[in-house]
Amino acid sequence: MKDYCAIEQIYHRPLDELLGEALQAKKLSGRNGVQFCQLLNIKSGGCSEDCKYCAQSAHYRTPIEKGALLDEEEILQAGLQAKEKGASRFCLGAAWRGLFEGETKTKKICKIISKISSLGMELCLSAGFLTEKTALMLKESGLKVYNHNLNTGPSYYPRIASTHRFEDRLQTIRIVQKVGLKLCSGGIIGMGERLKDRLEMLFCLYSLPEAPESIPINVYMPIEGTPFYGTPPLDYMDLIRMIATTRILFPLSRIRLAAGRKLLDEKTLTLCYLAGVDSIFIGEKLLTQSNVQLEKDYALLKKLNLRKEER
C-alpha cells in the first residue's frame, strides 16, 4: 500500500523510467486494444450545482440551454449508432444533482436503462449523487457501471464547488462499490489546481477498498461564462506524467483520456497512449464540447499500430 509521498515520488521519476514502468503496468491487464466509448448527454443544462468548470450549471451564463430528458427511443437510436461506430460502452450523462427515492426522473432513468440494456453494450451512467436504494434500483435495471468523478483533491475542492462537499462525492463512490456496480471515477486537470491537488485525488482513489474499473482523465476545456474561463492551459508534460502515474497505481483499471482530447496534438496523443491510456470517448460531442473526429482516431491508431478493442 503506497502513501501520498510514494505517489509523489512515482510522479517525479525520470521520464524514461516513469513511462517504462507505466508500460509494464499496462501489460498486467492483459488487454491489447483501445476501448471505444460513446457518451450521450441525455439531459443538458440547468444543473443546480455550481461547479465552476461546468457549462451546464444553472449558476452561470453559458451557451448551453436547459433541455428535457431525452425519450427512450432517442437514447436507443443513439446507442445503436454508437454500436455501429465501434463503441463497446455506452455512457449516459445527465445534468442534475442526483437520483433520489420517490423522484419521477429516477423511475424514468431505470426504465431507460432496462430498455437499452438489450443493445449488447456495457452501459454506464453519470447522474450525480446516489443513495444506496437508488444505486440498487439502477443495478436491478441492468446498469453495469456508474461514473462519479472526484474531479480534484479534497484541498482544492472548495474552490470548484460550494453546493456540495468532496465528502459527498466520496459517499456516492462508496455506495456504488457497496452495491456491486463497477466504478468509473477520475478527475479534471488544468483548472488552476496544484500538483498536490492532483496527487491527492489519486491517493483518494488508491485508498478505496477496490480500484475503480475505469479512471477518466479530463483536460480542462475553457468555457466562456464559467468562472474558470481564462485559466492558463495545461502543460502537456503534466498530463503525460499524470497518466503514467495513474497507470502505475492502477495497472488493471482502464485509463480513459476523456474531455479535452481535441486540444492535444498528435505527438501529445501518442505520448498519452505510451503513458498508459487504453480507452477513449468517440462521437462528435462530449456532453457540451466537440470531440476528435472518428476518422482521425482510426488514423492515429493505425499509425501507432494499435487496434480498437473488440467487444
UniProtKB/Swiss-Prot annotation:
Stretches assigned to coiled coil: none
Binding site for [4Fe-4S] cluster: C47, C51, C54
Domain of life: Bacteria
Cofactor note: Binds 1 [4Fe-4S] cluster. The cluster is coordinated with 3 cysteines and an exchangeable S-adenosyl-L-methionine. Binds 1 [2Fe-2S] cluster. The cluster is coordinated with 3 cysteines and 1 arginine.
Domain Radical SAM core: 32-258
EC number: 2.8.1.6
Keyword Iron-sulfur carried by entry: yes
Enzyme class: transferase
UniProt xrefs under Gene3D superfamilies: Aldolase class I
Catalytic activity: (4R,5S)-dethiobiotin + (sulfur carrier)-SH + 2 reduced [2Fe-2S]-[ferredoxin] + 2 S-adenosyl-L-methionine = (sulfur carrier)-H + biotin + 2 5'-deoxyadenosine + 2 L-methionine + 2 oxidized [2Fe-2S]-[ferredoxin]
Pathway assigned in UniProt: Cofactor biosynthesis; biotin biosynthesis; biotin from 7,8-diaminononanoate: step 2/2
PROSITE patterns: RADICAL_SAM
Positions bound to [2Fe-2S] cluster: C91, C124, C184, R256
A single GO BP: biotin biosynthetic process
Pfam families: BATS, Radical_SAM
Disulfide bonding pattern of the chain: none
Keywords: 2Fe-2S, 4Fe-4S, Biotin biosynthesis, Iron, Iron-sulfur, Metal-binding, S-adenosyl-L-methionine, Transferase
Gene Ontology MF annotations: 2 iron, 2 sulfur cluster binding; 4 iron, 4 sulfur cluster binding; biotin synthase activity; iron ion binding
Cofactor(s) named in the record: [4Fe-4S] cluster; [2Fe-2S] cluster
InterPro entries: Aldolase_TIM, BATS_dom, Biotin_synth/BioAB, Biotin_synthase, Elp3/MiaA/NifB-like_rSAM, rSAM
Quaternary context: Homodimer.
Similarity field: Belongs to the radical SAM superfamily. Biotin synthase family.
PANTHER family in the record: BIOTIN SYNTHASE, BIOTIN SYNTHASE, MITOCHONDRIAL
Designated name of the protein: Biotin synthase
Provenance organism: Methylacidiphilum infernorum (isolate V4) (Methylokorus infernorum (strain V4))
